[in-house]
Amino acid sequence: DFLYGMVTGTSWVLVPESVKFNLTGKLPEGVYARDLILTIIGEIGANGCNYQAMEFTGEGAKTLSISDRMALCNMAVEAGAKTGIFEADEKAIEYLKEHGREPKAVYHSDPDAVYAREYTFDLSKVRPVVAKPDFVDNVVPAEEACGIEINEAFLGSCNNGRIEDLRVGAE
């Protein structure tokens, strides 16, 4: 694909369908974005958004920190998605400005956008969860994993290597 683009100056890209995830409410204390995305993947399956875009929207989306939003978008691939996106809001624009990247344009979904599917998740009902071996959609409540001895743990990677994650792990 890369060589073809260099030679012809063109590229072929299939624009993915969008799947809308309307988020309501607010995550309870001690519940994190990874609990939310694992809950979503547990419901829709590891292939639930194959070659699609996961669009996170709604009043609940606005309550999530930028770090939480990054975690959801990063893990969208675990549901087979090509991308995960949030609608640009004041919090996102302010984050960009604070990091020297004022947006040149802000885009929003069309009011009459057509989605392949739509889901609603009440953030206040999300509970801590874990994905058991061997699949990311093998999601169970965290209390079902209590009592399992852990010899090693890794906090890092693109999924949970932000300073917020390290602080929680240190507690």
Identify what each model region corresponds to.
Residues 1-171:
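Fe-S-dependent hydro-lyases/dehydratases of central metabolism
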